[in-house]
From Swiss-Prot:
The keyword Flavoprotein does not apply. This is Isocitrate dehydrogenase kinase/phosphatase. Its EC number is 2.7.11.5, 3.1.3.-. Keywords: ATP-binding, Cytoplasm, Glyoxylate bypass, Hydrolase, Kinase, Nucleotide-binding, Protein phosphatase, Serine/threonine-protein kinase, Transferase, Tricarboxylic acid cycle. Its main location: cytoplasm. One of its GO terms (cellular component) is cytoplasm. The gene is aceK. The active site is at 371. Bifunctional enzyme which can phosphorylate or dephosphorylate isocitrate dehydrogenase (IDH) on a specific serine residue. This is a regulatory mechanism which enables bacteria to bypass the Krebs cycle via the glyoxylate shunt in response to the source of carbon. When bacteria are grown on glucose, IDH is fully active and unphosphorylated, but when grown on acetate or ethanol, the activity of IDH declines drastically concomitant with its phosphorylation. It comes from the Bacteria. GO terms for molecular function: [isocitrate dehydrogenase (NADP+)] kinase activity; AMP binding; ATP binding; phosphoprotein phosphatase activity; protein serine/threonine kinase activity.
Amino acid sequence: MPRGLELLIAQTILQGFDAQYGRFLEVTSGAQQRFEQADWHAVQQAMKNRIHLYDHHVGLVVEQLRCITNGQSTDAAFLLRVKEHYTRLLPDYPRFEIAESFFNSVYCRLFDHRSLTPERLFIFSSQPERRFRTIPRPLAKDFHPDHGWESLLMRVISDLPLRLRWQNKSRDIHYIVRHLTETLGTDNLAESHLQVANELFYRNKAAWLVGKLITPSGTLPFLLPIHQTDDGELFIDTCLTTTAEASIVFGFARSYFMVYAPLPAALVEWLREILPGKTTAELYMAIGCQKHAKTESYREYLVYLQGCNEQFIEAPGIRGMVMLVFTLPGFDRVFKVIKDRFAPQKEMSAAHVRACYQLVKEHDRVGRMADTQEFENFVLEKRHISPALMELLLQEAAEKITDLGEQIVIRHLYIERRMVPLNIWLEQVEGQQLRDAIEEYGNAIRQLAAANIFPGDMLFKNFGVTRHGRVVFYDYDEICYMTEVNFRDIPLPRYPEDELASEPWYSVSPGDVFPEEFRHWLCADPRIGPLFEEMHADLFRADYWRALQNRIREGHVEDVYAYRRRQRFSVRFV
């Protein structure tokens, strides 16, 4: 290879990333118009399009590089020089951290995810931790209650870029002040002020005002979800001011926000104060930088691994028929490998399973489906793997494992947030906790269905409980669109003997689902059955599911709330 080509390649990769992030910002900047026009289907399509941008632009750069090098192979020394040139381009670059991830992605695409070493890739960043460039304009604006909180909030809301009429701005401000007074007390509120992000955070059918409530005793989140009435008038649905509430809003089971962030590192750092429980990976994920979030997630894993003496073990819970799941006992993630062969009742391919996981990545997860990061050629040290797990890996996924002596390479796996399996949770709780869990499970099913997702396998073992007590679906191999399912009532038996027969007396076609049958496995536990019948009996009726299908086919997009119904102003104060 001629000298000087290394710099050209480095510049080509960075220019490719510039193009990708420019398109990312372009799609994001359309969020306000889509919201104001109430074009909810365009909102969903824009979300999918933005997710696809990254891989598309990686592919474009890879093709450019193959042309530049005439398809010739490159030796290790050449690649090291490319990375050195690329690193020199980053100190004055405003999005250096994601540019490093883009470099990694191009490298992995070129070399089929082989030789993934710190010398060749930005396994860890080349730049000082939390280093930021000069910000051309502040990310947020401060508001002080010099003339009272009503006046302050009127200024905040009047500063918003939204062009629609408000249904009743004074009413909403009154509700916010009432909430703040009840939360802080009159004296504390008088000594507090707001810092509000300049950009709105758009997701689903809401525009979120995100701010910080700075009080004498500390900083709290200040979140206002702005919705539209059927007449296209704006209203504020609630006010959230606890870190737990903010954590759920920015949760790993929700779709990514559309927020205009030309300097994502600065925005992540600004958010960190009101989301102290979120990792760097989770914050980047929340603002839509999912590929860099994958980089940060892998770094968090490496840091944890370096500081612990644990071994990987099979994850707690009932062993899956499609996925082999393992974890580190103290780590908050699980690792999921598609088995070589599935249980006989699972009539599907590995390609189908991967397609299901991609569907979840692109779909509106409505706070009820865990996000995943997908990895290829994932290296594990054998000394970190328990003997029992090693035996299980070789038994269930040998075709996906390469033995390198001291290490193994797993060809493909997913990393996902670790939760307590719902079936285990239900065994451990009683009273109100049990009731809350059953209510949450039913709500999860309803919200998934309203978002055009049918879980397929609805057993409790396929759901998990988060640290906030939310129930989240995480087993996707049988997932499908609601509109693909034929929900049927079980026909009446022709003769008394029909009910005693081992085979059904009616025909069953692929795609047929009989909701009456859900009762057999969801209500078998005498502690659970009565609660389920009380709160979710309609889930056992085919007409309930068919009515949802009709709404979906008519183009209706349901509202998705990242908080309890009782927190809505329309419920709380009316």
